[in-house]
Structures are given as structure tokens and as C-alpha cells.
Amino acid sequence: MKNMEQIDFVVTWVNGKDVDWCKRKSEFEKEYNIFQDLNSEERYREWGLMKYWFRAVEKYAPWVNKIYFITEGHVPNWLDVNHPKLVHVKHEDYIEKQFLPTFNSNVIEMSLIHLKDLSEKFVLFNDDCFINDFVKQSDFFENNLPKDTGIFSPLIPRENSLAPIVLNNMEIINKYFSKKKILEQNFSKFFNIKYGKHLLKNICLLPWSDLLGFYDSHIPVSYCKSNFLEVYEKEHAIFNLTFKNKFRNKNEINHWLIRYWQLSSGNFIPRNINFGKNYAISNEPTDIINELKLSKYKIICINDGESIDNFDEVKGLMINAFEKKFPEKSSFEKK
């Protein structure tokens, strides 16, 4: 049995410049009627920042147990795959063969139920989420429970958004949980001073008896693997439906379902809302560059702005800012 104090990091990465991968993706796009708003080319764009993700982890979270680096098979040419803390996982290593290849991030993340050696406690990162300052294990887990924010927020349907998928998540949550019981059993976890002004959301939504949605901060999520398995056992049909989708589809679920389950079960410890922040890259990413200098937030997520019209220029600015913050190579890089 693994040490319950161990915390793994899981990060998924796609090399959007890999010629063979792009060719396979293009072939399957012709075969499947994909939803372009959920599968735009910008979602696969390569920013060249992955080495700084590892530098940040080594500098700010040296206590991490293992890093599960999940890819289709490709590996950055600078990465030392023999590093003792690194576990390079190919899709074929844990995703059922019948569902491969997949270009669907939800399949890649929801299939973590099959990653046998993964610790009970892990933090799921996207490759656009970076540790921005020193963090402790207790920033992610406390008393063996995930740290998170229990903030209600109504689901707002928008074009080019994840709203349909989030709606599917919430249908399942309302199937198993009563908002009344949630608040009766864990009132202080939802009405907590650590949420700041976001407390108003929970107050304003009190008149509604059903759960209308949860606030998603778009930062790495702390998970207990047992919660993934519990939800899979109860709702394996929609898991399998999701697994069949080569590309993201409006009829599926994503890993936030497990997060909502943890929140609804009261299996979490409240965390300060200002722990992390989500930024969208724009043509002038001044706010992101300043944040890298000041480290106001422990975690930052840098979302690719689909409206960027000077990509190469902005990419250069971002790489320069990260290089200034993390100039020293990490031990994860080849010598």
C-alpha cells in the first residue's frame, strides 16, 4: 500500500507540432463529425513552456512524490525520461485499446481510473497551469482531504464553452445529492470566509433547492483516486460513452464531475480563493508577465486566447518572461 502522505502530480501534454500526430488527427477529423467549438486548433497550439513547468515544480514543490507525464507517445527532446521522480505514461499504457487513438482530453483525464500506480492523492494539471510560488503539501491536501473552494455558481450557456459538458456533470450530481443535505452536513465548508466576495454567490443561490453549478477556477485540482473509482462504479455507462469519443463532444463528461462529487460529499477542506488565478493570453500579455514577476498567486493558469493574431510574437514574450523567472535548468532536463 502506498504511503497516504505521498502526493503525485499528473500533467497531460500534447505536442501540437508533431507531424505524425497531426496527420493522424487530420485523418480522424475527416471521419468524425467533430464540434469545432470544442476542438479548435488553438487548443493544441504549442507554446514551448513545458520545460518551465518542470523547473517550477522542482523549485516550488520539491516534496512531490512522482510526476506522471502523460502524452500520446512523444516526449520533448530536452526531457530526461530516466529521472527517478518522472513516470512517462503513453496513452496506450492505460487507456483501453478500443478507444485509441484519442484526441479527446476528457478521455485522457477520465481514464486515470486505470492508472494503477497512481497515488491515492494526486493533483491534476493541464500543461498551461504553472506553480508560481512556494507551495506546501497542505496547500493541496489536509487531513487526507483535497483542498478546494465550495462555491456555487449557476451554469451559463455560452458559445465555444464547456457548458454542455458541465451540464452533463451537474445532471449526475443532482441525481445523487440533495443541496439541502449538503448544506446541513457541511454548512461551514460552503459558507467560509476564505471565499471572500464569492460568498455572495452561495447566499444568492440559497432560494434554489437544486444545485445549479459550481464555480470553476480553472487551476489544478486535488483529487482522491478513490473518488474517481466511486463515480465510475456508479456511472460507468457515461464514462464509456465519453471514452468512445475521439474528439470532445457535447454528450460527455469531464474530470470536473469528480471535483463536484468531492464537493457535494463534503470530502474537501476549504482553501483561500486567492490561491490561484486564471489568465487568458492576449496580444499584449502584460498582466501575465507582471504576475510572473510579483507571484501574487501560488498557481496560475494561462489559457490560450483564440483571438491572438500575432502568435509568434506573443509566444516569444511568454518564453522570455518564463526564462527570466526560471533561468536555471531543472534536473528533469538532459545535461
From Swiss-Prot:
EC assignment: 2.7.-.-
GO MF: transferase activity, transferring phosphorus-containing groups
EC top class named in words: transferase
Domain of life assignment: Bacteria
Short name of any one Pfam family annotated for the protein: Stealth_CR2
Annotated GO biological process: polysaccharide biosynthetic process
Keyword list, A-Z: Exopolysaccharide synthesis, Transferase
Alphabetized InterPro entries for the sequence: Stealth, Stealth_CR1, Stealth_CR2
Residue intervals passing through the bilayer: none
Regions annotated as coiled coil: none
Miscellaneous field: Stealth proteins are part of a protein family that is conserved from bacteria to higher eukaryotes. Family members were first identified in microbes as proteins that help pathogens to elude the host innate immune system. Microbial stealth proteins are involved in the biosynthesis of exopolysaccharides. Stealth proteins are predicted to function as hexose-1-phosphoryltransferases.
PANTHER family: N-ACETYLGLUCOSAMINE-1-PHOSPHOTRANSFERASE SUBUNITS ALPHA_BETA, PTHR24045
Record family assignment: Belongs to the stealth family.
Protein name from the UniProt record: Capsular polysaccharide phosphotransferase WcwK
Species in which this protein is naturally found: Streptococcus pneumoniae
